[in-house]
C-alpha cells in the first residue's frame, strides 16, 4: 500500500501532451461544450486540478527551466520553521502535502519548484486551448472570461509547501483576471485588494442580474472600468483545522497584513508592511512604532471573526 507521503512527495512527467490526464480531458470537454452551445447564451466553469500536488506536466514544460538556475525563496528552510520573533502558532509543524515529515534539500527544493512551474505552465496551456476555441468560434468579443485560483502556494518559504498550514501572503494570495469585452482595459492591473466572494456579484452586475439577497461580496465592476478607482474594503482570510473554530484570522489591506492566532490573539499576532517587506521577513506586531496600525487592524479582525462565528460553520450545499 502506498502512503500519502510517498505518493505526494514527487512530481510526474506526463506522456505526449498529457492527453491521458484529467486536465487535458477537461479542456477537451470545455471545447466540445463551446461548439455545442455557440449559438445560445451559456455559462461554463472549467476547473483544472493542476498545479495541485503532485505537480504534473509533459516533459517540454519542464524543459522551459534550468533547474540549477531556479532561485530559492529568501526565507527557505528545509522543514517547517517558526522564525525568531514569530508566534509558534503561525506555522503548522508538519507539511500536509509535499516533503511530509522530512527535510527538503536545496537541490530537491529547486527540482520541486521547477515541477510546480512546469505544472502551472501546462495548466496555462490548457487554458489557452479553451480561449483559442472562443476565438475560433467568434465568441471572444461577447464572452466574459474570469481566470481565478482558489488559493496560493508555498514553495519552501519557512519550510512550508503547498497551500495549508499558515496565513502568509504566499499561501493566501490568488490570481484573478477579468476579460470583459468593451469594459476592461487590456493589460491593466489594479492595486486594490479584493476577495473571491466578489466574483459572483461582479458577474451578476455585468450580466444585468440582481444577486440574491444575502450574498456576500461586492461587485468589482468599478475596478474593471477604472483599475485605480477608490476601494475601501480589505480582504480577510481564516485558518481553521476543524471548520468550526479559528486557528487564525487575518486581514490584508493594500499595505498591511495583520493576523491574530487564537481568540483575540491569545496565541500571538503578526503584522507586516508589505510595501517594505514583501517576503514577510520581519514581524512588526507589538512594535510600539506600529501600535496604532495594529490597533486599527485588530479591531477589523475581531469584528470579522465575531461576525462569521455568529453565522455558524460553513457547509457545502
Locate each region found by the language model.
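A generic structural signal for nonpolar/aromatic side chains embedded in well-ordered alpha-helices
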Residues: 46, 65, 223-224, 251, ...
